[in-house]
């Protein structure tokens, strides 16, 4: 048995480490996490408070952006002056329900890689190139196509759980104030 409240969670020791690590530098900071601090993390609000408090303490936008990728989606949003960017998966979008994968791959592949049953792969890997200078963070994304049957073929909506169902990583420019 696993307590679901302990999944997608930053423990108190890590929260304290983050707080102290941010205080220890006068440089701009970029965070990378698997789980989405803005939506999915059970105590994401506690993490965001640490980031926002550090920006308030120093009086400038020290914490610039937080990247994550767990949701296999693509979006950027601002919360209290900090950008949160969900970087799409390199190879597939997770649907969480059967996706007629038997139409994509032979039985032996589906049997060997059972996660394929609940996902829709891309025809080529996605990636992003991120550059940062004193004025901005620039993300140059990439795109692909869904391998058929596509979400549209499966009569799926454009988003699942509020997360865009896409085969791309968008180009984004985030100004650093």
Residue positions per predicted region:
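Surface-exposed beta-strand edges and their flanking turn/coil or helix-capping segments
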Residues: 3-6, 14-15, 44, 97-100, ...
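His/acidic metal-ligating clusters that form di-metal
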Residues: 5-85
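Short, well-ordered beta-strand micro-motif
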Residues: 1, 19, 129-131
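Binuclear metal-dependent phosphoesterase catalytic core
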Residues: 74-177
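Residue-level detector of alpha-helix boundaries and kinks
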Residues: 2-3, 115
């Amino acid at each position: 048995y696993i307590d679901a409240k302990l999944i997608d969670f930053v423990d108190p020791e890590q929260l304290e480490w983050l707080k102290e690590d941010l205080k220890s530098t006068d440089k701009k900071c970029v965070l990378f996490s698997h789980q989405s601090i803005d939506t999915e993390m059970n105590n994401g609000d506690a993490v965001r408070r640490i980031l926002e408090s550090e920006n308030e303490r120093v009086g400038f936008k020290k914490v610039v952006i937080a990247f994550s990728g767990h949701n296999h989606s693509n979006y950027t949003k601002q919360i209290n002056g900090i950008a949160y960017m969900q970087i799409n998966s390199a190879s597939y979008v997770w649907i969480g329900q059967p996706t007629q994968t038997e139409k994509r791959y032979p039985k032996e592949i589906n049997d060997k890689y059972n996660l394929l049953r609940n996902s829709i792969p891309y025809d080529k890997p996605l990636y992003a190139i991120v550059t940062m200078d004193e004025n901005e963070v620039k993300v140059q994304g990439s795109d692909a196509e869904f391998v058929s049957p596509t979400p549209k073929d499966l009569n799926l909506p454009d988003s699942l759980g509020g997360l865009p169902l896409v085969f791309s990583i968008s180009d984004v420019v985030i100004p650093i104030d």
